Amino acid sequence: MTDATGATPEPITPEPATPAPAMPAPAAPAGAPAIPADLRAAFDAYERAIVANDLDALDDFFAPGPETLRGDTAGLLVGHDAISGFRALRGGVPAREIAEIHYRPLGSDSALLMSVSQFVGGGRGLQTQVWQRIDGRWLITAAHVTPRTPALDRTIWRSVGDPFLQGAWEGPLAGLTVAVKDLFAIAGFRIGAGNPTYLEEARPEKATAPAVADLLRAGASLRGIARTDEFAYSIAGDNVHYGTPPNGAVVGALPGGSSSGPASAVALGHADIGLATDTAGSIRVPASYQGLWGLRTTHDLVPRQGMLPLAQSFDTIGWLTRDGETLQRVADWCLSYDGSSSTENVYGASGDDLPWRFVVPEEVLDCVEPATREAFSRLLAALAASDDPPSFRAVHMGDLDATFSAFRTVQGAEAWRNDGDWLRAHPGAVGPAVAERFRVASQITAYDEAAARAELEPIAALLAEVVDGAVMVFPTVPGPAPLRTADVDAVRAATLRMTAPAAAAGLPAVSIPLLRVGGAPVGVCLVSRAGTDIALVRLARRFAALAGGIR
């Protein structure tokens, strides 16, 4: 386990990116073919470029076009442009030397090279490359990199163990592991909120948040404390201090936030459950981007004690899982008992099943990218023609711009009340994007906030009426996860217009990984009336089973 005292972990600083030392070619095994001199020269030049992080030279060494390949433990990149975009964000690699290199000719103008890297700071890595002579130059057409094994991925985890904290030995969640978003109190540890300055000054917590304790009492163990976007004030999933967690479904794409760490941990198989928060979409967005199940619970249904707030009027707690059955187990336990010491199941509004009737909000579909809308329409048509056809009808939700504007105003006012004093005392401590959101929030007046709250009241009433006798269904987000190199401002605005209404109304919403668009996952969101969270997960599993059976 790391960070066992709750203290700030030692920063991991890459070794200086100095040029690789000139080395004689490692001796080839007896009988092995010798590497052609011009190919070895190209390989050595590539090594110098990669250690120096010479992006232009590295781009020039990979063959142009859409068929060039590069893979590593995170997944496969296809095409020169995708590889170049990944490399621009990666940063340099630690200093290393080539310990071994092996050559196998594949033809007169193509060859396989496999090499072992010895890192100056310890550890070894493996590179497999296919080189081809194109227009007189040796270029890489395919590469696979096996990096040295890290102690932990600091983009995903603040602290991690096996387990980090053991739960009860028996219970309905026994054997499952949890990635806890770095907003929840764990006795003896600090809350870091995705910011190293905040973590450094925080005091260890004296008690564990009920949302964490519930999972431990049910037999789950904690895998660790997972990263969050700073102060949970983002939906992209990036963090300027710790880096961007990998998207477990789409290489080089944003993971979605602000519950980025728990989502990536679950998607990559590091944990079974992500304990997360959702204010404006921070569970639903990463669930959609990474092909996960994600439940935003009814507002105030799960106690928020011991959770660092962003905007209390909308903050809610929920979970991310890889499958619907696990999400059902978590919801059944965490939402069905009457108090922490009770063994009686109290299902309340979830005692009955939700209707097999769905409404599709037209205004939300207007925010959806064409390919995603087409995939969603095909799904609904197939379900309607199935052996268990649900009914679908269109509904109107009014002006989403007005809803989002009012929501953002109230959210910003509360966020500034929660964190403004700290931000004023620590200028420059947060990244530019989050700093700008807080700057805008600081300008909101009491009159602005009161007016926005008044605007949200009829919107919440309308949504409650819409889901009174049916369940709302629509794509969770406009489309697949944007690449990390993309300009996400327009995507962010469209996404929040889709996710804010359910949050403004305090309704439960579940994202189901049902759509594929361009090979990437996109979720389908179901929204039901308040308090029906357990029944909503049951309905979502029925919906997903039917969708899976007709594909």
Descriptions of predicted regions:
Residues 2-4, 148-173, 336-496:
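Amidase signature
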Residues 38, 69-70, 77-124:
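Surface-exposed, charged secondary-structure patches
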Residues 40, 44-51, 59-75, 278:
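Short, solvent-exposed secondary-structure junction/capping segments
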Residues 105-107, 114-115, 129-271:
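Gly/Ser-rich catalytic/binding loops embedded in alpha/beta enzyme cores
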